[in-house]
Amino acid sequence: MTPAASLSSVGLVLALALAGCDILPGKARARAIEETAATPAMAFDALYARQCAGCHGTGGRLGAARPLNDPVYLALVPAERLRLVIAEGVPGTAQPAFARSAGGGLTEEQIDALVQGLVRAWARPEETKSVQVPPYAAALGDPDRGKAVYAAACAGCHGADGRGGPKAGSVVDPSYLALVSDQYLRTTVIAGRADVGMPDWRGYISGRPLAPVEISDVVGWLVAQRRPVPGRPVASASDPR
């Protein structure tokens, strides 16, 4: 064999060996892992666990933020508003934006998967289909009337002055009111927090639910207790998030 032929043979062997690396043990698995890592997660359970559970609780309950595993809340909030809150966050509060277009890390498809997954997993429409839920958003009511509503509907748990009572904590704490939006307060009055024993608007006064005007008035009273915190923006009263 001539030197040139020997070199050609060696080159052919090396080329075949290098080509064969793709079928070596572990090679296909490594490539699959790389491709999986580059594919955005779309499963609701995985998205919720990674993005939401830290604040809203494992299984949608008992977190620092309001429970999402709540059929009354999901019957109250319009789907497009729920999507907006997840995608763009709530300015002036601890709710961040998750959409990439707003500085977060999720695609539009992932945002849709979260919204659809929340409704599919936890809405339970059979429990709320006959319930006339109050309006999600409304103008703030009269604080003076709201003070009377608070005394009748809320003081038994939260104390006469709102600073905490035998069953529940303060609703006028400056740090709390600085962290939440007007709409959050309204949503909490309507939907309650079943995971910690707080009833919804039907359970505050024996024998009847709160009327829509009473809800707006007591929210107006709560908002009137808020004090500005230097350097911290407050969510706009006109922004129903």
Could you say what each language-model-derived stretch is?
Residues 1-10:
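Bacterial N-terminal signal peptides that target proteins for export
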Residues 10-16:
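Sec-dependent N-terminal signal peptides
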Residues 44, 48-58, 114, 146-160, ...:
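The canonical Cys-X-X-Cys-His
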Residues 34, 38-41, 45, 57-87, ...:
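Gly/Gly-Pro-rich "capping" loops immediately C-terminal to redox-active cysteine motifs
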Residues 136-142, 153-156, 160, 166:
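Extended amphipathic alpha-helical interaction segments
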Residues 22-46, 120-149, 232-241:
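Electrostatic cytochrome c docking/interface patches
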Residues 63-70, 88-121, 132, 136, ...:
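Axial heme c-ligation environment in periplasmic c-type cytochrome domains
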Residues 18-20:
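C-terminal motif of bacterial Sec signal peptides marking the signal peptidase cleavage site
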